[in-house]
UniProtKB/Swiss-Prot annotation:
Highest taxon above the source species: Bacteria
Pfam families: Ribosomal_S13 (PF00416)
Protein name: Small ribosomal subunit protein uS13
Keywords: Ribonucleoprotein, Ribosomal protein, RNA-binding, rRNA-binding, tRNA-binding
Gene3D superfamilies in alphabetical order: 1.10.8.50, 30s ribosomal protein s13, domain 2 (4.10.910.10)
NCBIfam families per record: uS13_bact
One GO process term, biological-process aspect: translation
Subunit text: Part of the 30S ribosomal subunit. Forms a loose heterodimer with protein S19. Forms two bridges to the 50S subunit in the 70S ribosome.
SUPFAM superfamilies: S13-like H2TH domain (SSF46946)
Listed PROSITE patterns: RIBOSOMAL_S13_1, RIBOSOMAL_S13_2
Length: 121
């Protein structure tokens, strides 16, 4: 397995798809990285030479990916929560922050339904 940015890239996949295993790299960015590195994106990862892998590592290194990106996203959310702005409050409460309705739906953010407790007599 090829190792790029601390992630093992699956050997059986095409280079374009394999690079998407790295957090922060999607299909579009993956293809642009392959073009910039001069590597055929339809080539399987197992068929890449060491020189190709080194070029890919160099191109991926130009972007914020994996741990650094995760840390940046977490810090952005923490900043919103510390500011106390609407989005931060919604993050803190675990509710949707982009204007979706919550009277019904929003189960992904709110979690599973709590069972209604029976009334005591």
């Amino acid at each position: 397995m090829a190792r790029i940015a601390g992630v093992n890239i699956p050997n059986h996949q095409h280079t374009e798809i394999g690079l998407t295993a790295i957090f922060g790299i999607g299909r579009t960015r993956s293809r642009s990285i392959c073009v910039a590195a001069g590597v055929d994106f339809s080539k399987k990862v197992k068929d890449l030479t060491d020189a190709d892998l080194e070029k890919l590592r160099e191109e991926v290194g130009k972007f914020v990916v994996e741990g650094d990106l995760r840390r940046e996203v977490t810090m952005n959310i923490k900043r919103l929560m510390d500011l106390g702005c609407y989005r931060g409050v919604r993050h803190r409460k675990g509710l949707p922050m982009r204007g979706q309705r919550t009277r019904t739906n929003a189960r992904t953010r709110k979690g599973p339904r709590r069972a209604a407790q029976a009334l005591k007599k």
